[in-house]
Curated annotation (Swiss-Prot):
Its EC number is 2.4.1.-. Coiled coil: none annotated. SUPFAM superfamilies: UDP-Glycosyltransferase/glycogen phosphorylase (SSF53756). Belongs to the UDP-glycosyltransferase family. It holds the Pfam family UDPGT. It comes from the Eukaryota. The keyword Nucleotidyltransferase does not apply. InterPro entries: UDP-glycosyltransf_plant (IPR050481), UDP_glucos_trans (IPR002213). UDP-alpha-D-glucose binds at residues 283, 335-337, 352-360, 374-377. Keywords: Glycosyltransferase, Transferase. This is UDP-glycosyltransferase 91C1. It comes from Arabidopsis thaliana (Mouse-ear cress). It is an enzyme of class 2 (transferase).
Length: 460
């Protein structure tokens, strides 16, 4: 009889169609594969092509399973990721995603994995897994504080909060003092997203069923960082909740020459140690023209070196590039963010505060400057700011407007002013927590022990 502690598991991974979800799922896949387990990573053709190439020692352990995304009305051709469609088309992408149920069910029936680890959008998956006798875990890319703010699965399914004001106060199930709430201008976007759209199912309901019908919940964080929130989360969910650590960023060797990185590195190499502010607001957010203008003028006024990444070509102020030439670099399109954040000349990170970016930035000890734009980013900002980690750009509470002075002041505080010394020191301390690979591996080891003890009886 094979010892359960030595048994090789077959684990299927099914992330939502966004790079900010695909990459952490792949990171966890690699860590499980390094422990000797077999992984089936399921997504669409274009998303799989976008993923970084596997190291040769993992190629035999991770199999990419590709399902074409069914075409639907309202979704532009070749749109397979949230980065391919505007914000107001996200629900159309989910409608196409929901049509993957038949091929996914057939694959699971044929391959009989021991576990399937899934994302929030596939609320229909747990019932399929249960029918096939496959153990199922919801992998949350949100931290424990955000999950607690969202509440127990029943509150999500019943959608008990519906107005912006409902989201700007601490919910009744949080029994201790908390600053984890949305600002009004943040929540107006969030509440819009909870409404039913072309799929007939809101994001709130998707989350609720994904949590409620799971056998366990895996969380990309750890109790050392948010102890009170993990304790509350276990009370709210009443099922196994496992921290998996931060899945810290790793710079992998790549034989291919990355011409984009070569050009960026050449510029960064010329800058002083910890002098550069890296500016990136994610792949999904689209800033209005006036916001781009104020952000640009704020970077100019800060008199600090900066590297600014934009997803598409915006209209920046006339003469801006000329005035900041040599001190600032503007790049349109994809960049190797982990490599940039690892560079010694980068000291600060003006970020939308998506959890992936938070982990990557603090994993290298970079000081965050918060500019939340969408989704749970405001909650992440409150969590970090409450711990003295970083500075938030001042904005109008109602409409989210800001001016160039608030941008410049935030940058100078983090990068130059004596008053920011404590903030800079705390970010460096966080590097030992967010970037500690050994400590994070310990959480993955505990996760594997649990999965082995609870997995299905299907063959590997």
């Amino acid at each position: 009889m094979v010892d359960k502690r030595e048994e090789v598991m077959h684990v299927a991974m099914f992330p939502w169609l966004a790079m900010g979800h695909l990459l952490p799922f792949l990171r966890l896949s690699k860590l499980l594969a390094q422990k000797g387990h077999k992984i089936s990573f399921i997504s669409t053709p274009r998303n799989i092509e976008r993923l970084p190439k596997l190291q040769s020692n993992l190629a035999s352990s991770i199999t990419f399973v590709s399902f074409p995304l069914p075409p639907i009305s309202g979704l532009p051709p070749s749109s397979e990721s949230s980065m391919d469609v505007p914000y107001n088309k996200q629900q159309s992408l989910k409608a196409a995603f929901d049509l993957l149920q038949p091929p996914l069910k057939e694959f699971l029936r044929r391959s009989s994995p021991d576990w399937i680890i899934y994302d929030y959008a596939s609320h229909w998956l747990p019932s399929i897994a249960a029918e096939l006798g496959i153990s199922k875990a919801f992998f949350s890319l949100f931290n424990a504080a955000t999950l607690c703010f969202m509440g127990p699965s029943s509150s999500l399914i019943e959608e008990i909060r519906s107005t912006p004001e409902d989201f700007t106060v601490v919910p009744p199930w949080v029994p201790f003092k908390s600053n984890i709430v949305f600002r009004y201008h943040e929540v107006t976007r969030y509440v819009e997203k909870t409404e039913e759209d072309v799929t007939g199912v809101s994001d709130s309901v998707r989350f609720g069923y994904s949590i409620d019908e799971s056998d366990a919940v895996f969380v990309r964080s750890c109790p050392e960082f948010e102890p009170e929130w993990f304790g509350l989360l276990k009370d709210l969910y009443r099922k196994p909740v496992f921290p998996i650590g931060f899945l810290p960023p790793v710079i992998e060797d790549d034989d291919a020459v990355d011409t984009t990185w070569v050009r960026i590195k050449k510029w960064l190499d010329k800058q002083r140690l910890n002098s550069v502010v890296y500016v990136s607001l994610g792949t999904e957010a689209s800033l209005r023209h006036e916001e781009v203008t104020e952000l640009a003028l704020g970077l100019e006024k800060s008199e600090t070196p900066f590297f600014w990444v934009l997803r598409n070509e915006p209209k920046i102020p006339d003469g801006f590039k000329t005035r900041v030439k040599g001190r600032g670099m503007v790049h349109v399109g994809w960049v190797p963010q982990v490599k940039i954040l690892s560079h010694e000349s980068v000291g600060g990170f003006l970020t939308h505060c998506g959890w992936n970016s938070v982990v990557e930035g603090l994993g290298f000890g970079k000081v965050p400057i918060f500019f939340p734009v969408l989704n749970e980013q405001g909650l992440n900002t409150r969590l970090l700011h409450g711990k003295g980690l970083g500075v938030e750009v001042s904005r109008d509470e109602r409409d989210g407007s800001f001016d160039s002075d608030s941008v410049a002041d935030s940058i100078r505080l983090v990068m130059i002013d004596d008053a920011g010394e404590e903030i800079r020191a705390k970010a460096k301390v966080m590097k030992d927590l967010f970037g500690n690979m050994d400590e994070n591996i310990r959480y993955v080891d505990e996760l594997v022990r649990f999965m082995r003890s609870k997995g299905s009886s299907s063959s590997s």
